[in-house]
Amino acid sequence: MRVLVLGSGVIGTASAYYLARQGFEVTVVDRQPAVAMETSFANAGQISPGYASPWAAPGVPLKAIKWLLERHAPLAIKLTGDVDQYLWMAQMLRNCTASRYAVNKERMVRLSEYSRDCLDELRAETGINYENRSLGTTQLFRTQAQVDAAAKDIAVLEQSGVPYELLDRDGIARVEPALAGVKDILAGALRLPNDQTGDCQLFTTKLADMALKLGVEFRFGQDIQRLDFAGDRINGVWIDGKLETADRYVLALGSYSPQMLKPLGIKAPVYPLKGYSLTVPITNADMAPTSTILDETYKVAITRFDNRIRVGGMAEIAGFDLSLNPRRRETLEMIVNDLYPRGGDLSQASFWTGLRPATPDGTPIVGATGFRNLFLNTGHGTLGWTMACGSGRLLADLIARKKPQISAEGLDISRYGNSREVAKHGQSAPAHQQ
């Protein structure tokens, strides 16, 4: 059985790898010249199941108003006049209740924990190396209010059986020695010892190499134009003016997925959350992070690779704008100077931006659609790296009609209700354009 995977980020590549392991004949198509050239290229490097939390949370609407007035705010909104942007934000606001937050976080943690286990298994089986470390994540709180607010997250961690450790200032210095000199500006921390780190782009490149050995074909530099459909089936995909056919189709196009799906009557509430990162060469290893920290105030992660520090975070709801905002670089540099002032050379840092495909409830869309041979793997937001292996393996099981190792409840697009209006026979308009 032939499967056509659209998109070669970490999600599409993981999907292809696990499908090939199930015995499918897999082809991956992407407009870029190689895998992981867009959102997966320079993310924060964290694999953090315990910190899998939706942006839609109690108190966020009021915080968002406050953040609009702050120079170094973790969230910024640039209204584009796009109806989809307004609808997405309205849906996000509806998910900012305590009850919805608990449901959404459970789904995200469930998939993230499974994904971490899949990654562990993959690493044990293959020896894949991607500058990975398994030294945990430390979430830094600058105020006592942040420490107190962590109680609701700890309750979910306990319910999910995720190990954690609350740290005082001395505890922070113990797990991250380079922070000893600045511990007085911190109020405490929450550490998840089972979290991991690694270079997502490097991982995706090596996973693609392993997929090639399993027979997966990668076709780069090709324009994915539209889906051809009739009734409840996909007939093929128009790629560079030619109709390509398969038995099953997987859409893993990140923020560009809705453009492809809308003509089919599928309303996928995925919208880009623009994020930024700096990659900083290490000049003093003793003054650099040991693993990864998450600054709760600014929603920024600082992660240690072999000889580099990756600083990433923030979110702009600004449509498909990929321009580099110098104020965001200023914020990232400010946080590095605040916490690790002697760790790396900021003058040699590379600045990057990417569009994370976010759903309004934070949970990705993984699974079947109203079309019998079309499957989705998209909407992972800031957690694509964390959820990649689990999402790929889960989807492969679903396509193979095998019972997944975790519950898939609440993960597919049906949770949004009428996800497909009645689609007329015909072809879609062009999509997947930047």
Swiss-Prot record:
UniProt entry tagged with the keyword Oxidoreductase: yes
GO BP: D-alanine catabolic process
The protein's enzyme class: oxidoreductase
Annotated pathway: Amino-acid degradation; D-alanine degradation; NH(3) and pyruvate from D-alanine: step 1/1
One of the record's GO cellular component terms: cytoplasm
Catalytic reaction equation(s): a D-alpha-amino acid + A + H2O = a 2-oxocarboxylate + AH2 + NH4(+)
Cofactor: FAD
InterPro entries, per the entry: DadA, FAD-dep_OxRdtase, FAD/NAD-bd_sf
Cited SUPFAM superfamilies: FAD-linked reductases, C-terminal domain, FAD/NAD(P)-binding domain
Chain's role: Oxidative deamination of D-amino acids.
Family label: Belongs to the DadA oxidoreductase family.
Name by which UniProt lists this protein: D-amino acid dehydrogenase
